[in-house]
Amino acid sequence: MSARKKLSTFFSRYAVVIIFVIITLIAIPPSGLSIKYILQEIITRLGRNSFLVLALLLPIYAGMGLNFGMTLGAMAGQVGLIFAVNYGISNWQGLVFALLVGLPISVLLGYVCGLVMNRAKGREMVTGYILAFFINGIYQFFVMYMLGSVIPMGNKSIVLSRGYGIRNTLNLESVRQSLDNIVMLRVGGFSIPLVTFIVIALLCVFVVWFKKTKLGQDMRAVGQDMAVAEAAGIPVEKTRIVAIIISTVLACAGQIIFLQNMGNLATYNAHDQTGFFAVAAILVGGASVTHASIANVFLGVTLLHAMFVVSPLAGQKLFGSAMIGEYFRQFIGYGVIAISLVLYAWRTRKAAAEARLSLRGAQNGPGKGNGKPAVGNGGQA
Amino acid sequence: MRNFKTFIQDFGWPRIIIFFFLVALFIMAPFVGVRLDASFSDVLNRFGQNAIMVLAMVPMIQSGCGLNFGLALGLVAGLLGATLSLQLELHGMLGFLGAIVLATPFSIIFGWFYAKLLNKVKGEEMTIAMYVGFSFIMFMCIMWLILPYNNPTMVWGYAGKGLRTTISVENYWLKILNNFLAIKIGQFFVFPTGLLLFVALFAFLMWLFLRSKTGTAMTAVGSNPDFARASGVDVDKMRTISVIISTFLGAVGIIVYEQSFGFIQLYTAPSPMVFPAVAAILIGGASINKASMVNVLVGTILFQGLLTMTPSVINSLLQTDMSEVIRIIVSNGMILYALTRKIKVSK
């Protein structure tokens, strides 16, 4: 009984990871891609995406769920890059400049995001999601109407022909892969962007260190139980705001790293999918709404992007249509988020029901404590 | 005076601002060369087009399931009904009603499974509904490509299979409701009688339903689940009913929208249609746990009025198209306002 239960807990906890490994393994042979190509792609994408995904960790520790509001940081980073291109600052200096511009904006946006989320406790995720849309409207307004009219843009080649507003696609030639190419390690036919990985490693060290600080401990306490933390004298609302600000700033830096690797910026929709991909990645890596680790991030990015690499070609081969592969990967991305959230909510309710049953004592016995009856009780008892 | 104050508080500042903004737009319209009669006609038309999808929000809000971000399931059921009706070559009123009848079983099945899922995740419905909706749309994208439809007006010409992204309903049931008993005044104003009657019929049925025994029980579940359970109401069953009704109304809503708009839009088209419906009912004064017919009426008129008037008036005023930005800010700002407000109310 107990062993079976353990096994079922294991499966329900790692269900998403297991499903993902299986789908990807099945899709590799029909895609016709060599293992070496897939590995190189994964290395590139680890460098490109890990930083963004790591930005999700702190809000999870603080009990605020998956921070869909990270898109705010991504927009701040894009504004920074637009100015870097405008002033013609190239190479890694351009990236640093973009970060310096993005930093105050992302701190401000993070603060706003924290305030809004404090007013919507228990609904942080959906609120963050909508807030990202809302700020997107302001971003569009700023980039499309303010830049070039209210704020003068020196570089006319990035401005729309009507005289104000930024062009739909911005060529980031001047800063393209400038972080990756500082030291490009070539080992056994693979190219590894060393500096990018060092930056990511430093962030990991920061996260580990931060968790041990007073603030980090407070954050975990708030994440466990807000009422208890409040009673223990921790400023709950402030701690939550700090968590979101750090996350937003990291997302700003992450988006700059992401875009320098991509090499061009879709001015008006590059940030649309940022939150979606980052959240999907961390969930694929086995994280949940309340638990996440650095390992989840790297496992998740690897698995998610392995599937993204193979699925269009596999779709082409299996169904004769690349579009099917494309739709399939989006279906899986959204589906993974949905399944993880469902499993998490379901587990929480089950745990609560079991706790209630154990309180009720001996006459019910442990026999009723597992599986379906307990779930039903959540609604009925 | 106190009455007035509480009224303002209940109604909420954002709505009042939007209302006056809309009035200002209407006042400005003639001065910038926008015809008022044509504008009114547009607003009425778009109100009818969208009202049923907004109405679909009501049952789930009432039963405590929150805003139905998973309305896409209903929309997809409607798309299935519409495409099947075209596939069966149903024309005219028969085609339109046929689409609704054909969509009904799908909406009930989707709604039932959707409700089962939502009952397992009480408290987290909104985020989950959103992602269930998205992933279902993506799943259906694959289905639209491989389902064996073969009506030449619907499939890609060169491949002979796979549905087109937009399908015209011109030869089938274009504007079948809009033109029913339509009253034409002058050159630019058309009163879409049939469309509005149809909307009124559904709103009336919903109003009746909310006052029936089941409807009252459903509202009780939304107001206080523990109390409802103590008085012998089956909470999960009531929630299931509300989700199925909501999904069904979503299906009817998109078919009504299509007959007026003229095209069936497939693939990823349903996903951007959900948020406007959510925003509209919130602009109308609903909160995430209370909604009424008045909210639907006021909200749809205000929101669609805004969508109709901002492009024409603001564009002629500023010589630039800011309507998209205004739409994004207003609709999402409204949802955000509702999400952050409930705490204050429950205190």
Q: Which residues does each predicted region cover?
A:
Chain A
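Membrane-interfacial amphipathic/re-entrant helices at transmembrane-helix boundaries
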Residues: 1-54, 91-93
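Single transmembrane alpha-helix segments in multi-pass membrane proteins
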Residues: 24, 36-87, 111, 116-122, ...
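Central hydrophobic cores of alpha-helical transmembrane segments
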Residues: 73-77, 128-134, 294-307
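Alpha-helical transmembrane segments within multi-pass membrane transporters and channels
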Residues: 90-136, 304
